[in-house]
């Protein structure tokens, strides 16, 4: 049998990693062994970041809803409880958008929440 030389596969594997390390500084871009570690760590950070992004946005929405609810004389928890009792099912993303862009609409929602809490 003929001897199999693996130069092509090795070059392809190295090129793939070094392409992913584009934009890194110094050895992290140029040296395969260092670049491979840098790429693996970067992919770990990216994976973690995709999970954190969901948490961060939910926290931002809650902060915005809370600020708008307090302007209308309610705390966040009482506002959300009032909406639940009033049968209004809007998610936090939509409520935060209404709070930022449509103050009058949010005030109307707050009044409905107050009415449901009083009843």
UniProtKB/Swiss-Prot annotation:
Keywords: Ribonucleoprotein, Ribosomal protein, RNA-binding, rRNA-binding
GO molecular function: rRNA binding; structural constituent of ribosome
UniProt KW Ribosomal protein keyword: yes
Gene Ontology BP annotations: ribosomal large subunit assembly; translation
Cross-referenced Gene3D superfamilies: 6.10.160.10, Ribosomal protein L20
A Pfam short name: Ribosomal_L20
Any one GO cellular component localisation term in the record: ribosome
Its biological purpose: Binds directly to 23S ribosomal RNA and is necessary for the in vitro assembly process of the 50S ribosomal subunit. It is not involved in the protein synthesizing functions of that subunit.
Record protein name field: Large ribosomal subunit protein bL20
